A protein has these predicted regions:
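AAA+ P-loop NTPase catalytic core and its hallmark functional loops
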Residues: 1-137
């Protein structure tokens, strides 16, 4: 059963599901990033959370998932990326995290200095940052 079918089964508005389908066709994923689109093995149940999150994404808003450990934030993020057919990157923050770790840095490779992109650079390059509508930018 597809994620969209599971949303239907959960009682999510058919209008929202049609808007998700429109979003998917409007923002196709490059072939090189298709392997990063999650295929969740578990489904997040919570129709209110789903409807609010779907509406926010379709309106070009960002989401901040907050809660105690083991409350389903990562599971929901994985499900949401799968529903919208978007690639997913996991970035673990630590005490030594700096801008170069996120954006990228020059590195020495095969006798040449090359740029090694970080996750923020890669996400921006693939269009995953700034999906807000023009009037909101």
């Amino acid at each position: 059963m597809s994620l969209l079918d599971k949303l239907r089964e959960l009682g999510i508005s058919e209008n929202l599901i049609k808007e998700i389908e429109k979003f998917r066709s409007q923002y196709p994923v490059d072939k090189e990033y298709e392997s990063r689109i999650p295929v969740p093995t578990q489904f997040y149940y919570g129709s209110d959370v789903w409807e609010q999150a779907i509406t926010a994404v379709l309106c070009g808003e960002n989401l901040l998932l907050v809660g105690e450990k083991a409350t389903g934030k990562n599971l929901f993020a994985e499900n949401l990326a799968g529903v919208f057919n978007r690639p997913r990157w996991d970035v673990s923050f630590h005490v030594n995290m700096d801008a170069a770790s996120l954006i990228g840095t020059d590195t020495f490779c095969a006798g040449e200095v090359t740029f090694r992109p970080g996750p923020v650079y890669t996400a921006a390059k693939t269009g995953e940052i700034g999906r807000a509508s023009c009037r909101e930018r």
